[in-house]
Amino acid sequence: MARKLMVALAVVVTASVAVLQGQGKRAAGPSVDVFKSATCGCCAKWVDHMRNAGFAVHVSDLEEPELQKIKGRYGVPASARSCHTAPVEGFTVEGHVPASEEKRLLKEKPAVVGIAVPGMPLGSPGMEVSGVKPHPYNVLTFDKQGATTVYSVQKP
């Protein structure tokens, strides 16, 4: 009886350690501060996408005038703006950028201010709609002068 109890206890402890280690790895990714509107459901879905990709995400809900000031402060050109802004490791991420493209940005470290998915294209992370065909969209880089360049074409 004591042996069965010890085996069961060992299984529980091992499983608990594995779960805790997995949580630690998930939160150990790059830290992202997301500035968004409290009423934007698609932004909340994008935050979930980022967390699921291993990013440590902190969210600040702002009123629209403050959100626009943040976009200006982080150098997002008007032509590249979307619904949320997220500084990460010295870069600015604007809109529904896939986590894979953010990881690429952090690995390559191009000489840009940031990357953006202008607008809210269907099929981008957080903008998935059941029964609606996703649209191809561009991920853009932007520089200090506000010039944009296609970084990648997404075909969900």
Could you tell me what each predicted segment is?
Residues 1-4:
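Positively charged n-region of N-terminal signal peptides that target proteins for export
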Residues 16-27:
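Bacterial Sec-dependent signal peptides at the C-terminal "C-region" and cleavage site
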Residues 39, 46, 63-66, 98-102:
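Stable alpha-helical elements in mature extracytoplasmic
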Residues 29, 33-37, 59, 65-69, ...:
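Mature soluble domains of exported/periplasmic/lumenal proteins and thiol-rich metal-chelating peptides
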Residues 26-53:
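Local sequence-structure signature of Cys/Sec-based thiol-disulfide redox active-site neighborhoods
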Residues 44-84, 88-89:
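N-terminal, post-signal-peptide region of Sec/Tat-exported proteins
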Residues 72-156:
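Thiol/selenol-based redox catalytic cores and closely related redox-interacting motifs
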Residues 8-16:
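Bacterial N-terminal signal peptides
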